[in-house]
Amino acid sequence: PIAETDDAGTVHDRLMAIGAALVVETVDRIIDHDGHVETTEQESLTTDTAPLRDAPKIFRDTCHIDWCQPTERVYNFIRGLAPYPAAWTEILSADGRRMALKVFRSERIAEPHALSPGAIRTDGRRHLDVATEDGFLRLLDVQPAGKRRMTADQFLNGTDVSACCMA
């Protein structure tokens, strides 16, 4: 099962290990049965009657975070794109400057508010919370454009976001 804190990277790594073990098991069965292995039609493994579709190509704009969505949806959007290609947003300063920010990890805060989606709530040192439609997301791991990945408190040590919002 996929845990609440898993992201695409952790699921990928787990499936990679399962796949490697399955390859070894399959080769062992082929050897044990003189090259004969019972096959299974792939169609028999699905129970849904809807046709399968190809996954859409992911572009940079596809990865942009829409803070007007419910907290759960934004949280899952970030998890689904982490660690690569990574969800991103822009920090809009009071003077109109924009800074791209990739978001790798966050946590949900179920707290009603009257703030606009994308509004930033911070203590300036450790917590970087962004308002969503129905709560907040606390950003935990981020990467400013042109810099390395860092924790939110490391980011806040060098960046004043008190008069900023997310775009």
How would you label these PLM feature ranges?
Residues 1-109:
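Active-site-proximal loop/hinge segments within enzyme catalytic domains
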